[in-house]
Amino acid sequence: MNREEQLGVLESLLFAAGDAGLSTEQLTEVMEITHIEALNLLELLSERYNESADRGLILLELAGTFQLATKKAHAEFLRKLVEVPSNTVLSQASLETLAIIAYRQPVTRMEVDEVRGVQTDGPIRTLVAKGLVTDKGRVDGAGRAKLYVTTSEFLDAFGLNSLEDLPKLADPATDEPDQNEMDLFFDRFNQSKEQEEE
């Protein structure tokens, strides 16, 4: 791979890693490059983000990991996006992610990934943007991953007074919700959203 291709791979990996970020050790293993090469690529990508007005991202180093973030100059537009009401029905991936967070909170994105068996960065961003989920602190130790919890808006959207009102788990040993109860639960949520749109 030439340098430009390496930068493209690096950017893809950082995007996929989301809030968890990537360490130089992870980059050297995945990209099969040296530690120095990883640092050089990170520095070059950071310079490109910082020097170009048409790029909306920056590269941050937090607690030994690197992650992409939006530029502060665009904060006003991002705030507007979050504030724009959205009555769209949640996707199956978002509903599954929301159920995992609701039952296991506080929980990290990586823990949600393990339960679902796929990356959940996109669904979590959607849930945060819709105000159903928020981050509440970080895990102690390496990586300092964000901990996600549901919000009061989540309770309102699902007609719950508290988390105690969630459908009961069929088998506490597995921590998996009863599928029939969950289907009824999410159907009720989707119906309420459809009624709001009418």
Curated annotation (Swiss-Prot):
Pfam families hit by this protein: SMC_ScpB
Protein name per Swiss-Prot or TrEMBL: Segregation and condensation protein B
InterPro entries according to UniProt: ScpB_csome_segregation (IPR005234), WH-like_DNA-bd_sf (IPR036388), WH_DNA-bd_sf (IPR036390)
BP GO terms, sorted: cell division; chromosome separation; DNA replication
PANTHER family: SEGREGATION AND CONDENSATION PROTEIN B (PTHR34298:SF2)
Oligomer and partners: Homodimer. Homodimerization may be required to stabilize the binding of ScpA to the Smc head domains. Component of a cohesin-like complex composed of ScpA, ScpB and the Smc homodimer, in which ScpA and ScpB bind to the head domain of Smc. The presence of the three proteins is required for the association of the complex with DNA.
Gene name tied to this protein: scpB
Organism this protein belongs to: Listeria monocytogenes serovar 1/2a (strain ATCC BAA-679 / EGD-e)
NCBIfam families named in the record: SMC-Scp complex subunit ScpB (TIGR00281)
GO cellular component, one term: cytoplasm
Purpose of the protein: Participates in chromosomal partition during cell division. May act via the formation of a condensin-like complex containing Smc and ScpA that pull DNA away from mid-cell into both cell halves.
Gene3D superfamilies for the chain: Winged helix-like DNA-binding domain superfamily/Winged helix DNA-binding domain
Region (Disordered): 168-198
Annotated compartments: Cytoplasm
